[in-house]
Amino acid sequence: DRRQRQMCIRDSANGENSAVGNGILPQSAEYILDCGVDLITLGNHSLKRKEIYDYLDSSAPIIRPANYHSSAPGRGIEIIDKGYCKIAVINLQGAVYLDPIENPFSVIDSLIDKAKSEGAGIIIIDFHAEATAEKKAMGFYVDGRVSAIFGTHTHTQTNDNQILPNGTGYITDIGMTGPYYSVLGVAVEPAIQKLKTGLPTRFINEDGVCTLEGCLFEIDEKSGKTVNTKLIRR
């Protein structure tokens, strides 16, 4: 059924910019969850909308980057109990080319330890980052200690899905779900004018045919390692 199909495709989905404009609202989060997603991860626009603050502090299955300041609403790790195994999902934000934030390399070790101490046999990281080198380095840093790490933020799917030497599934960026003929989801003409003139421009979402992008990681439940990866684009 639809629920089983969604679970096969993904246990988590990045909900960044699901609200009109950017950020996320409680109603857009509920819409994503109603589609069958088990958990929503976020990124650098997590706190853009104040309406989401109480929702982030609730028990709803939504997390924001774990390396946000401790005063920020929400949490950065979630344990999903599927019955047959526990899956930990960790959300991190990169420090290169984005707003100042605690170094993700300084917090990930304790997060992995926390996931394992709570019985998670599978650990997945959503690394919301701009710099490809930072994403790649993080992949190698956690290789063998987590099941899979996927990058988000650039809205552009990369073609480097792979299994790292110690069994961790990796992709630099899973892409976006949104209008195919667009500039990262934004209407083409305003984006061109902004880049051409350098003048303030009001961006609007593009309409038209949409694409769903992502990456499927096949993970062995016993070893917690990725055995196969496949790009998704529909």
PLM features: residue spans?
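Active-site beta-strand/loop signature of hydrolases that rely on acidic residues for catalysis
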Residues: 10-19, 40-43, 124-127
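Binuclear metal-dependent hydrolase catalytic cores centered on His/Asp/Glu-rich metal-binding motifs
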Residues: 73-122
